[in-house]
């Protein structure tokens, strides 16, 4: 009888322990994000405002790189940015619709070129333009875009987190860097919730 009571208590203890783990609310996470608000690849910290809140915030660091080439030369842009935002989760603890909005501000190292006249000296002191040549330009510029996110968020019982969705964004303060004013970019992320 005594062994049955001990076995019953151990079983009850295990069930309570498992139940307590299921009720564990994971309000914080760290994830690696590709595209979307990170503007390339980024590392982000995300948290709920409190344990029972569906509202949360995110802050991270992003890096983006773009390179193009044509018959005139090569251009590249490296971006180092900080995406910050708020989000709201609709659904359960495991599967949720994530709706968010925020700003991404950063410094963009722009390597570009411009055209300048190409002259030859015809006689001493006289020049004649015979064409155009490219001149490299290197400059750092400030850039910013406002974004929203609409996506799916999966958080397992053990803390694995997967996110995927789309980021509509409006670029401003990107003079000479970004050719598009409105961008629609997908995103995907993998991380750990705790």
Model-derived regions: residue spans:
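Transmembrane beta-barrel outer-membrane domains
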Residues: 23-25, 34-38, 73-79, 139-145, ...
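Sec-dependent N-terminal signal peptides
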Residues: 4-14
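N-terminal secretory signal peptides
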Residues: 40-46
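Gram-negative (and chloroplast) outer-membrane scaffold detector with strong preference
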Residues: 46-160
């Amino acid at each position: 009888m005594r062994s049955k009571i001990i076995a019953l208590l151990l079983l009850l203890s295990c069930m309570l322990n498992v139940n307590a783990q299921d009720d564990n609310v994971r309000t914080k996470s760290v994830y690696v994000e590709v595209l979307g608000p990170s503007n390339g690849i980024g590392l982000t910290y995300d948290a709920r405002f409190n344990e029972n809140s569906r509202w949360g915030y995110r802050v991270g660091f992003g890096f983006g790189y773009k390179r193009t080439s044509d018959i005139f030369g090569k251009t590249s842009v490296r971006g180092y940015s900080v995406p910050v935002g708020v989000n709201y989760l609709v659904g359960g603890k495991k599967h949720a619709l994530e709706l968010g909005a925020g700003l991404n501000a950063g410094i963009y190292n722009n390597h570009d070129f411009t055209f300048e006249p190409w002259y030859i000296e015809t006689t001493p002191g006289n020049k004649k333009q015979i064409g155009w040549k490219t001149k490299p330009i290197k400059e750092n510029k400030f850039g910013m875009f406002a974004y929203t996110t609409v996506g799916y968020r999966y958080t397992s019982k053990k803390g694995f987190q997967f996110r995927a969705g789309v980021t509509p964004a409006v670029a401003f303060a990107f003079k000479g860097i970004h050719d598009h004013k409105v961008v629609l970019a997908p995103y995907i992320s993998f991380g750990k919730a705790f």
